[in-house]
Amino acid sequence: EWGFTPENQIGELRSAALPMSLNRQPHYTNGFVIVGDAGGMVSPFNGEGIAPAMKAGRYAAEAMAQALARTHRAGIDRAMSAYPQRIRDEYGGYYQLGRIFVRLIENPRIMRLCTTYGLPIPRLMTLVHKLLSDGFERQGGDFDDRLITTLSKMVPSA
C-alpha cells in the first residue's frame, strides 16, 4: 500500500521546470490537441496555469465543434487550426512581456529600483497588479487595460 512512512519521507530533493510561455508546441497537429501545462500555458508572470488551461480547453472544444461539422480531413484541419491561432492571439504577446519582465527583475539593481521607487506609488502598483495577475481586460477597459493590451501587441508573440 502506498503512503508516507518514515523510510520514504526523506529523499533527494528534485524539481522540474514549469512549462511556460507557450514553450510546448504544436498545440494542434494530426488530430492531437494539447492544452494547459502540456501546452506550456503557465504564466511567466506568476506561475499560474489553471485559468489559461480552462480557457484553452474552451477554445479547443469550440474548434472541435467546428471540426466535427466537416466531412474532409482538410476541412477538419482548417477548423482545428483556429485553436493554436487563438491561443497565440490570447497569450503570445502577454507571455512574451512576462519573459521580458522576468529578465528585468532578475537584475538586483533593477529590482531594488522597482521596490524603492515603484512600490510607494499606488497608481503604478494597480497597473503592476493587473499585469502580473493577468487581470486586465483585453478589449475595452481602463487606461491600464489598454496599455497592457497595447504592450502585448507590440512585442513578438511567444
Q: Model regions: which residues?
A:
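FAD/FMN-dependent oxidoreductases across multiple families
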Residues: 1-64, 69
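C-terminal helical "tail/cap" subdomain of flavin- and related membrane-associated enzymes
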Residues: 65-158
